[in-house]
């Protein structure tokens, strides 16, 4: 579960924490459930945490790296996404995983989410497999 959890009822947060704990040893696919999530807020909270560590002497400014920022995000335990499937033909990220999506391949389909079928998913995967990933290079 990722997102700003203030305002989420405590009983639901406990259930979310229990579910996370029960599944932490699982292998395979990662499922992210975003609740009250916004990437700008996520980055802002990470920067505030790092700034407080610098202010209180636990961290030097020269120690701030991309890796440290990444480890301060909600998704610190998860790999960055390799593929983002955007349904409904929307040509925007909508404030979703902005930091983590730096090198993510994006597949855009006109199909709306409720109509997205296993065949649509296969089409996205097939296109992804044909791409040459450059990780920001030429």
Q: Predicted segments — roles?
A:
Residues 1-138:
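Flexible, compositionally biased loop and terminal segments
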């Amino acid at each position: 579960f990722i997102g700003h959890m203030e305002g989420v009822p405590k009983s639901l947060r406990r259930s979310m924490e229990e579910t996370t704990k029960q599944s932490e040893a699982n292998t395979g696919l990662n499922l992210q459930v975003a609740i009250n999530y916004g990437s700008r807020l996520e980055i802002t909270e990470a920067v505030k945490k790092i700034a407080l560590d610098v202010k209180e002497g636990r961290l030097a400014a020269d120690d701030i790296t991309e890796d440290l920022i990444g480890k301060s995000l909600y998704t610190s335990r998860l790999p960055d996404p390799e593929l983002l499937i955007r349904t409904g033909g929307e040509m925007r990220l909508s404030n979703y995983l902005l930091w983590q999506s730096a090198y993510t391949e994006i597949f855009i389909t006109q199909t709306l989410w409720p109509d997205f079928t296993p065949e649509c998913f296969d089409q996205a995967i097939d296109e992804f497999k044909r791409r040459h990933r450059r990780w920001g290079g030429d």
